[in-house]
A protein has these predicted regions:
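Hydrophobic h-region of N-terminal signal peptides that target proteins for export
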Residues: 10-18
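Extracellular pro-sequences of secreted precursors
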Residues: 18-232
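Sec-dependent signal peptide recognition
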Residues: 2-8
Length: 232
């Protein structure tokens, strides 16, 4: 009996290992706002591990990869890749622009690690939806696209205001994917500089002082560059 249980346990462990794969990277996990003021924001991002899991669908079995401190990215139907997505405070009057100042690159053949073709990004599913009623979306053209980017794509935008704070979104793609060869290029040890061109420091401080409330400290703390607010 004990021998049978041991065999079952070993099979279960083996199946789990097959379903979950890891790629060890050369860096440690970091997502840090190094400095932030009315003129600019400097940040660094690095990753220690890529984790992958199998994803079964009516189109076959795909893989799903993730990096620490990232969210799901990619257009619906296109290969799903991890994305850095941070909410930032932007000074009033500023036109933000982002500059990638440093990064390293390493290419990985996913097949070497038992990782299958990356799953297409799917539409969000409501809690009350039946999964069987949700169609599987796959952009065939996107899966015929060859090539890897030479540098990480980065973007920043202004998205509105909250309690006197102008909000922006900083997005960085740390992974480029070639679905034809099933190869990824990981951009690691990324350093970016966000410039706040034309920032109106006086108006920004005035709005913060006018609308600040300790009740919203928990909300402010969610901002990537929250010290830019707490230090005013």
């Amino acid at each position: 009996m004990k021998k049978a249980l041991f065999i079952i346990l070993m099979i279960a462990i083996g199946l789990s290992a097959m379903a979950q794969q890891k790629i060890q990277l050369r860096s440690t996990d970091k997502s840090e706002c190094v400095s932030s003021d009315m003129n600019s924001l400097r940040a660094t991002f690095s990753f220690s591990t890529i984790e992958a899991e199998d994803y079964s669908s009516d189109r076959g079995t795909f893989s799903w990869i993730s990096l620490p401190n990232t969210v799901l990215g990619g257009e619906v139907g296109n290969p799903q890749v991890p994305v850095i997505n941070e909410l930032i405070a932007v000074p009033y009057g500023a036109t933000p622009r982002i500059e990638v100042t440093r990064y390293s690159t390493t290419d990985y053949s996913l097949e070497d690690y038992g990782i299958k073709t990356l799953v297409p990004r799917q539409l969000p599913v409501r809690k009350n939806q039946n999964l069987e009623d949700v169609p599987f979306v796959m952009n065939e053209d996107a899966y015929q696209t060859r090539g890897l980017r030479s540098e990480p794509h980065a973007a920043v935008s202004v998205d509105g205001t909250m309690r006197g704070v102008q909000l922006g979104k900083m997005t960085i793609d740390p992974v480029s994917y070639d679905p034809v060869s099933n190869t990824i290029r990981v951009f690691n040890d990324i350093e970016v500089m966000v410039h706040f061109d034309g920032a109106d420091a006086q108006t920004t401080k005035k709005m913060l002082m006018k609308t600040y409330s300790p009740a919203f400290d928990a909300v402010y703390s969610q901002l990537f560059n929250n010290k830019a607010i707490t230090d005013v």
